[in-house]
Protein backbone atom coordinates (compact mmCIF):
# COMPACT_ATOMS: atom_id res chain seq x y z
CA UNK A 1 0.00 0.00 0.00
CA UNK A 2 1.27 3.42 -0.95
CA UNK A 3 1.97 5.47 2.20
CA UNK A 4 1.26 8.93 0.75
CA UNK A 5 -2.42 8.34 -0.23
CA UNK A 6 -3.00 6.67 3.14
CA UNK A 7 -1.63 9.70 5.04
CA UNK A 8 -3.78 12.01 2.89
CA UNK A 9 -6.96 10.07 3.64
CA UNK A 10 -6.08 9.91 7.34
CA UNK A 11 -5.45 13.67 7.46
CA UNK A 12 -8.78 14.43 5.76
CA UNK A 13 -10.61 12.16 8.19
CA UNK A 14 -8.88 13.75 11.20
CA UNK A 15 -9.73 17.24 9.92
CA UNK A 16 -13.39 16.30 9.41
CA UNK A 17 -13.64 14.86 12.94
CA UNK A 18 -11.98 17.96 14.41
CA UNK A 19 -14.47 20.25 12.65
CA UNK A 20 -17.43 18.16 13.82
CA UNK A 21 -16.25 18.15 17.46
CA UNK A 22 -15.33 21.86 17.55
CA UNK A 23 -18.29 23.36 15.70
CA UNK A 24 -20.66 25.67 17.60
CA UNK A 25 -24.04 24.26 18.53
CA UNK A 26 -25.94 26.76 16.39
CA UNK A 27 -24.09 25.83 13.19
CA UNK A 28 -24.07 22.76 11.02
CA UNK A 29 -20.82 21.04 10.09
CA UNK A 30 -21.10 22.37 6.53
CA UNK A 31 -21.69 25.96 7.63
CA UNK A 32 -18.77 25.82 10.05
CA UNK A 33 -16.51 24.31 7.37
CA UNK A 34 -17.41 27.11 4.95
CA UNK A 35 -16.75 29.67 7.70
CA UNK A 36 -13.29 28.22 8.41
CA UNK A 37 -12.53 28.12 4.68
CA UNK A 38 -13.41 31.81 4.33
CA UNK A 39 -11.11 32.67 7.25
CA UNK A 40 -8.24 30.79 5.65
CA UNK A 41 -8.90 32.49 2.31
CA UNK A 42 -8.89 35.93 3.92
CA UNK A 43 -5.62 35.20 5.69
CA UNK A 44 -4.08 33.90 2.48
CA UNK A 45 -5.15 37.07 0.68
CA UNK A 46 -3.67 39.23 3.45
CA UNK A 47 -0.39 37.33 3.46
CA UNK A 48 -0.24 37.43 -0.32
CA UNK A 49 -0.63 41.22 -0.29
CA UNK A 50 2.09 41.52 2.36
CA UNK A 51 4.37 39.25 0.36
CA UNK A 52 3.86 41.30 -2.82
CA UNK A 53 4.62 44.50 -0.89
CA UNK A 54 7.81 42.99 0.53
CA UNK A 55 8.89 41.73 -2.89
CA UNK A 56 8.33 45.21 -4.32
CA UNK A 57 10.45 46.73 -1.53
CA UNK A 58 13.23 44.21 -2.09
CA UNK A 59 13.24 44.94 -5.83
CA UNK A 60 13.38 48.67 -5.16
CA UNK A 61 16.37 48.15 -2.85
CA UNK A 62 18.07 46.07 -5.54
CA UNK A 63 17.46 48.89 -8.01
CA UNK A 64 19.01 51.44 -5.64
CA UNK A 65 21.99 49.17 -5.02
CA UNK A 66 22.70 48.69 -8.72
CA UNK A 67 22.46 52.41 -9.44
CA UNK A 68 24.66 53.19 -6.44
CA UNK A 69 27.32 50.74 -7.62
CA UNK A 70 27.36 52.28 -11.08
CA UNK A 71 27.41 55.82 -9.65
CA UNK A 72 30.23 55.00 -7.22
CA UNK A 73 32.23 53.53 -10.08
CA UNK A 74 31.74 56.73 -12.05
CA UNK A 75 32.71 58.85 -9.04
CA UNK A 76 36.02 57.00 -8.70
CA UNK A 77 36.84 58.13 -12.22
CA UNK A 78 36.29 61.74 -11.25
CA UNK A 79 33.30 63.77 -9.96
CA UNK A 80 33.06 65.64 -13.26
CA UNK A 81 32.01 62.41 -14.97
CA UNK A 82 28.79 62.10 -12.97
CA UNK A 83 25.62 63.23 -14.77
CA UNK A 84 23.30 65.83 -13.31
CA UNK A 85 19.77 64.49 -13.02
CA UNK A 86 16.71 66.73 -12.96
CA UNK A 87 14.06 66.74 -10.25
CA UNK A 88 11.11 65.96 -12.49
CA UNK A 89 9.14 62.76 -12.29
CA UNK A 90 7.25 60.65 -14.83
CA UNK A 91 3.91 62.08 -15.83
CA UNK A 92 1.14 61.16 -13.41
CA UNK A 93 -2.39 60.14 -14.21
CA UNK A 94 -3.55 63.72 -13.72
CA UNK A 95 -1.56 64.84 -16.75
CA UNK A 96 -3.36 63.23 -19.64
CA UNK A 97 -2.64 63.60 -23.30
CA UNK A 98 -4.11 66.78 -24.71
CA UNK A 99 -5.48 65.01 -27.77
CA UNK A 100 -8.00 63.33 -25.52
CA UNK A 101 -9.73 66.63 -24.76
CA UNK A 102 -11.80 66.44 -27.95
CA UNK A 103 -14.55 63.95 -28.66
CA UNK A 104 -12.90 62.50 -31.73
CA UNK A 105 -15.64 63.93 -33.94
CA UNK A 106 -14.05 67.33 -34.72
CA UNK A 107 -13.13 67.58 -38.39
CA UNK A 108 -11.53 71.03 -38.35
CA UNK A 109 -7.97 71.09 -39.64
CA UNK A 110 -7.02 73.53 -36.88
CA UNK A 111 -7.98 71.12 -34.11
CA UNK A 112 -6.99 67.89 -35.78
CA UNK A 113 -3.55 66.31 -35.44
CA UNK A 114 -2.54 64.12 -38.34
CA UNK A 115 -0.93 60.75 -37.55
CA UNK A 116 2.41 61.91 -38.97
CA UNK A 117 2.42 64.94 -36.65
CA UNK A 118 1.48 62.76 -33.69
CA UNK A 119 4.27 60.31 -34.53
CA UNK A 120 6.84 63.09 -34.89
CA UNK A 121 5.77 64.69 -31.61
CA UNK A 122 5.96 61.37 -29.79
CA UNK A 123 9.42 60.51 -31.14
CA UNK A 124 10.70 63.92 -30.08
CA UNK A 125 9.36 63.44 -26.55
CA UNK A 126 10.30 59.81 -25.93
CA UNK A 127 13.19 60.79 -23.66
CA UNK A 128 11.34 61.16 -20.34
CA UNK A 129 12.69 63.37 -17.56
CA UNK A 130 14.98 61.85 -14.96
CA UNK A 131 14.61 61.74 -11.21
CA UNK A 132 17.25 62.34 -8.56
CA UNK A 133 18.74 59.43 -6.68
CA UNK A 134 17.75 57.73 -4.49
CA UNK A 135 14.46 56.40 -5.78
CA UNK A 136 11.56 57.74 -3.78
CA UNK A 137 8.69 55.75 -2.32
CA UNK A 138 5.28 56.85 -3.60
CA UNK A 139 1.80 56.12 -2.19
CA UNK A 140 0.41 53.06 -3.95
CA UNK A 141 -3.11 54.28 -4.55
CA UNK A 142 -3.32 53.49 -8.27
CA UNK A 143 -1.82 51.05 -10.72
CA UNK A 144 0.55 53.76 -11.94
CA UNK A 145 2.17 54.59 -8.59
CA UNK A 146 3.99 51.28 -8.00
CA UNK A 147 5.44 51.63 -11.50
CA UNK A 148 6.83 55.11 -10.89
CA UNK A 149 9.87 53.64 -9.13
CA UNK A 150 10.52 51.33 -12.08
CA UNK A 151 10.26 54.27 -14.47
CA UNK A 152 12.72 56.26 -12.35
CA UNK A 153 15.09 53.30 -12.24
CA UNK A 154 15.07 52.75 -16.01
CA UNK A 155 15.54 56.45 -16.71
CA UNK A 156 18.51 56.68 -14.32
CA UNK A 157 19.98 53.49 -15.74
CA UNK A 158 19.81 54.75 -19.33
CA UNK A 159 21.27 58.12 -18.33
CA UNK A 160 24.16 56.55 -16.42
CA UNK A 161 24.84 54.20 -19.31
CA UNK A 162 24.99 57.13 -21.70
CA UNK A 163 27.58 58.82 -19.50
CA UNK A 164 29.71 55.71 -19.11
CA UNK A 165 29.77 55.26 -22.88
CA UNK A 166 30.59 58.92 -23.55
CA UNK A 167 33.39 58.70 -20.96
CA UNK A 168 34.69 55.41 -22.39
CA UNK A 169 34.19 53.73 -19.02
CA UNK A 170 33.42 50.06 -18.46
CA UNK A 171 31.95 50.54 -14.98
CA UNK A 172 28.38 50.27 -16.18
CA UNK A 173 28.82 46.97 -18.00
CA UNK A 174 30.80 45.44 -15.12
CA UNK A 175 28.03 46.00 -12.58
CA UNK A 176 25.22 45.28 -15.01
CA UNK A 177 26.67 41.92 -16.04
CA UNK A 178 26.73 40.87 -12.37
CA UNK A 179 23.16 41.97 -11.61
CA UNK A 180 21.14 41.99 -14.84
CA UNK A 181 18.32 40.13 -13.03
CA UNK A 182 17.38 43.37 -11.26
CA UNK A 183 16.65 45.03 -14.59
CA UNK A 184 14.86 42.01 -16.06
CA UNK A 185 12.66 41.67 -12.95
CA UNK A 186 11.78 45.37 -13.20
CA UNK A 187 10.96 45.00 -16.90
CA UNK A 188 8.78 41.98 -16.10
CA UNK A 189 6.74 43.98 -13.58
CA UNK A 190 6.42 46.89 -15.99
CA UNK A 191 5.15 44.52 -18.69
CA UNK A 192 2.64 42.97 -16.27
CA UNK A 193 1.18 46.40 -15.52
CA UNK A 194 1.11 47.41 -19.19
CA UNK A 195 -0.67 44.18 -20.14
CA UNK A 196 -3.25 44.74 -17.39
CA UNK A 197 -3.94 48.30 -18.51
CA UNK A 198 -4.06 47.70 -22.27
CA UNK A 199 -6.46 44.78 -21.90
CA UNK A 200 -9.10 47.40 -21.15
CA UNK A 201 -7.75 50.89 -21.90
CA UNK A 202 -10.10 53.69 -20.94
CA UNK A 203 -10.37 57.42 -21.44
CA UNK A 204 -8.89 59.80 -20.44
CA UNK A 205 -5.69 58.16 -21.66
CA UNK A 206 -2.86 59.01 -19.26
CA UNK A 207 0.45 59.98 -20.82
CA UNK A 208 2.09 57.82 -18.15
CA UNK A 209 1.36 54.72 -20.20
CA UNK A 210 2.77 56.11 -23.44
CA UNK A 211 5.89 57.16 -21.52
CA UNK A 212 6.13 53.64 -20.08
CA UNK A 213 6.00 52.17 -23.60
CA UNK A 214 8.57 54.75 -24.72
CA UNK A 215 10.90 53.73 -21.88
CA UNK A 216 10.42 50.08 -22.80
CA UNK A 217 11.34 50.93 -26.39
CA UNK A 218 14.49 52.75 -25.26
CA UNK A 219 15.53 49.69 -23.27
CA UNK A 220 14.88 47.45 -26.26
CA UNK A 221 16.90 49.76 -28.51
CA UNK A 222 19.96 49.41 -26.29
CA UNK A 223 21.95 46.36 -27.39
CA UNK A 224 23.63 45.60 -24.05
CA UNK A 225 20.41 45.98 -22.08
CA UNK A 226 18.13 44.15 -24.48
CA UNK A 227 20.59 41.30 -24.96
CA UNK A 228 20.26 40.35 -21.28
CA UNK A 229 16.75 41.47 -20.44
CA UNK A 230 14.46 40.41 -23.23
CA UNK A 231 15.67 36.84 -23.56
CA UNK A 232 14.20 36.42 -20.05
CA UNK A 233 11.04 38.41 -20.78
CA UNK A 234 10.47 37.38 -24.40
CA UNK A 235 7.22 35.50 -23.72
CA UNK A 236 5.78 38.37 -21.71
CA UNK A 237 6.84 40.88 -24.35
CA UNK A 238 5.14 38.79 -27.01
CA UNK A 239 1.99 38.74 -24.86
CA UNK A 240 2.13 42.53 -24.57
CA UNK A 241 2.37 42.94 -28.35
CA UNK A 242 -0.67 40.68 -28.81
CA UNK A 243 -2.54 42.59 -26.10
CA UNK A 244 -1.98 45.86 -27.96
CA UNK A 245 -3.22 44.26 -31.18
CA UNK A 246 -6.36 42.92 -29.52
CA UNK A 247 -7.02 46.32 -27.92
CA UNK A 248 -7.37 47.67 -31.47
CA UNK A 249 -9.19 44.81 -33.18
CA UNK A 250 -11.65 43.83 -30.44
CA UNK A 251 -12.73 47.35 -29.50
CA UNK A 252 -16.31 47.90 -30.69
CA UNK A 253 -17.24 51.02 -28.71
CA UNK A 254 -18.55 54.07 -30.54
CA UNK A 255 -15.69 56.28 -29.37
CA UNK A 256 -13.01 53.63 -29.94
CA UNK A 257 -10.97 55.60 -32.47
CA UNK A 258 -9.44 57.83 -29.77
CA UNK A 259 -8.14 54.83 -27.84
CA UNK A 260 -7.00 53.12 -31.03
CA UNK A 261 -4.91 56.15 -31.97
CA UNK A 262 -2.81 55.88 -28.81
CA UNK A 263 -2.63 52.10 -28.81
CA UNK A 264 -1.52 52.28 -32.44
CA UNK A 265 1.19 54.77 -31.53
CA UNK A 266 2.43 52.38 -28.84
CA UNK A 267 2.86 49.67 -31.48
CA UNK A 268 4.67 52.13 -33.76
CA UNK A 269 7.00 53.02 -30.89
CA UNK A 270 7.80 49.35 -30.26
CA UNK A 271 8.18 48.73 -33.99
CA UNK A 272 10.81 51.45 -34.22
CA UNK A 273 13.24 49.19 -32.30
CA UNK A 274 15.35 46.86 -34.41
CA UNK A 275 14.89 44.11 -31.80
CA UNK A 276 11.07 44.25 -31.94
CA UNK A 277 10.58 45.37 -35.54
CA UNK A 278 10.38 41.88 -37.04
CA UNK A 279 7.90 40.53 -34.47
CA UNK A 280 5.64 43.59 -34.78
CA UNK A 281 5.56 43.43 -38.59
CA UNK A 282 4.99 39.67 -38.51
CA UNK A 283 2.13 40.01 -36.02
CA UNK A 284 0.36 42.76 -37.97
CA UNK A 285 0.79 41.13 -41.38
CA UNK A 286 -0.52 37.84 -40.00
CA UNK A 287 -3.74 39.59 -38.98
CA UNK A 288 -4.00 41.42 -42.32
CA UNK A 289 -3.50 38.16 -44.25
CA UNK A 290 -6.15 36.45 -42.15
CA UNK A 291 -8.64 39.26 -42.76
CA UNK A 292 -7.89 39.23 -46.50
CA UNK A 293 -8.74 35.51 -46.63
CA UNK A 294 -11.97 36.05 -44.68
CA UNK A 295 -12.99 39.02 -46.81
CA UNK A 296 -12.28 37.10 -50.01
CA UNK A 297 -14.47 34.20 -48.87
CA UNK A 298 -17.28 36.57 -47.88
CA UNK A 299 -17.10 38.40 -51.22
CA UNK A 300 -17.23 35.13 -53.14
CA UNK A 301 -20.26 33.84 -51.21
CA UNK A 302 -21.96 37.27 -51.09
CA UNK A 303 -22.02 37.02 -47.30
CA UNK A 304 -22.17 39.67 -44.57
CA UNK A 305 -18.88 40.88 -43.12
CA UNK A 306 -18.08 42.33 -39.68
CA UNK A 307 -18.15 46.12 -40.19
CA UNK A 308 -16.36 46.83 -36.88
CA UNK A 309 -13.50 44.49 -37.72
CA UNK A 310 -13.32 46.01 -41.20
CA UNK A 311 -12.99 49.52 -39.73
CA UNK A 312 -10.45 48.45 -37.11
CA UNK A 313 -8.16 46.79 -39.66
CA UNK A 314 -7.27 50.21 -41.11
CA UNK A 315 -5.41 51.04 -37.88
CA UNK A 316 -3.13 48.11 -38.66
CA UNK A 317 -2.42 49.54 -42.11
CA UNK A 318 -1.44 52.86 -40.54
CA UNK A 319 0.87 51.16 -38.02
CA UNK A 320 2.58 49.11 -40.72
CA UNK A 321 3.09 52.19 -42.90
CA UNK A 322 4.65 54.11 -40.01
CA UNK A 323 6.95 51.25 -39.00
CA UNK A 324 8.07 50.55 -42.57
CA UNK A 325 8.85 54.21 -43.30
CA UNK A 326 11.05 54.85 -40.29
CA UNK A 327 14.58 53.60 -39.63
CA UNK A 328 14.82 51.22 -36.66
CA UNK A 329 16.38 52.57 -33.46
CA UNK A 330 19.40 50.82 -32.04
CA UNK A 331 20.61 49.61 -35.46
CA UNK A 332 20.44 52.25 -38.16
CA UNK A 333 22.02 49.92 -40.71
CA UNK A 334 19.34 47.25 -40.28
CA UNK A 335 17.26 46.43 -43.36
CA UNK A 336 13.91 44.78 -43.87
CA UNK A 337 13.97 41.04 -43.26
CA UNK A 338 12.04 39.58 -46.19
CA UNK A 339 12.34 36.07 -44.83
CA UNK A 340 9.28 36.79 -42.66
CA UNK A 341 6.71 34.17 -43.77
CA UNK A 342 3.79 36.57 -43.35
CA UNK A 343 5.47 39.09 -45.62
CA UNK A 344 6.13 36.50 -48.31
CA UNK A 345 2.50 35.36 -48.13
CA UNK A 346 1.27 38.94 -48.45
CA UNK A 347 3.45 39.75 -51.46
CA UNK A 348 2.72 36.48 -53.27
CA UNK A 349 -1.03 37.06 -53.40
CA UNK A 350 -0.90 40.87 -53.38
CA UNK A 351 -1.88 41.58 -57.01
CA UNK A 352 -4.50 38.85 -57.15
CA UNK A 353 -6.21 40.04 -53.96
CA UNK A 354 -6.34 43.67 -55.12
CA UNK A 355 -7.88 42.64 -58.45
CA UNK A 356 -10.46 40.43 -56.72
CA UNK A 357 -11.51 42.89 -53.99
CA UNK A 358 -11.19 46.24 -55.77
CA UNK A 359 -14.84 46.37 -56.89
CA UNK A 360 -16.50 45.38 -53.61
CA UNK A 361 -13.94 46.96 -51.24
CA UNK A 362 -12.12 49.74 -53.14
CA UNK A 363 -10.75 51.53 -50.05
CA UNK A 364 -9.41 48.30 -48.56
CA UNK A 365 -7.81 47.38 -51.90
CA UNK A 366 -6.21 50.83 -52.08
CA UNK A 367 -4.59 50.39 -48.65
CA UNK A 368 -3.39 46.93 -49.65
CA UNK A 369 -1.77 48.47 -52.73
CA UNK A 370 -0.05 51.16 -50.63
CA UNK A 371 1.27 48.56 -48.21
CA UNK A 372 2.52 46.43 -51.09
CA UNK A 373 4.39 49.40 -52.56
CA UNK A 374 6.14 50.01 -49.23
CA UNK A 375 7.11 46.36 -48.80
CA UNK A 376 8.41 46.07 -52.37
CA UNK A 377 10.34 49.35 -52.00
CA UNK A 378 11.92 48.09 -48.79
CA UNK A 379 12.87 44.85 -50.53
CA UNK A 380 14.46 46.69 -53.46
CA UNK A 381 16.38 48.95 -51.06
CA UNK A 382 17.67 45.93 -49.15
CA UNK A 383 18.85 44.19 -52.33
CA UNK A 384 20.51 47.40 -53.51
CA UNK A 385 22.39 47.90 -50.23
CA UNK A 386 23.48 44.26 -50.08
CA UNK A 387 24.85 44.40 -53.63
CA UNK A 388 27.04 47.43 -52.90
CA UNK A 389 30.74 46.59 -52.25
Swiss-Prot record:
Q: Does the keyword Repressor apply?
A: no
Gene ablation phenotype (knockout):
Deficient DNA double-strand break formation during meiotic recombination.
Native source species: Mus musculus (Mouse)
Q: In which tissues is it expressed?
A: Expressed in adult testis and brain and in embryonic ovary.
> What sections of the protein cross the membrane?
none
Q: Name one GO cellular component term.
A: chromosome
Q: Where is this region: Interaction with REC114?
A: 1-127
One Pfam annotation, family name? Answer: Mei4
Q: Which gene encodes it?
A: Mei4
Q: What is this protein called?
A: Meiosis-specific protein MEI4
Does the keyword Transmembrane helix belong to this entry? Answer: no
Role: Required for DNA double-strand breaks (DSBs) formation in unsynapsed regions during meiotic recombination. Probably acts by forming a complex with IHO1 and REC114, which activates DSBs formation in unsynapsed regions, an essential step to ensure completion of synapsis.
Q: Assembly and partners?
A: Part of the MCD recombinosome complex, at least composed of IHO1, REC114 and MEI4. Forms a complex with REC114; the interaction is required for MEI4 stability. Interacts (via N-terminal domain) with REC114 (via C-terminal domain). Interacts with IHO1.
Q: Which UniProt keywords apply?
A: Chromosome, DNA recombination, Meiosis
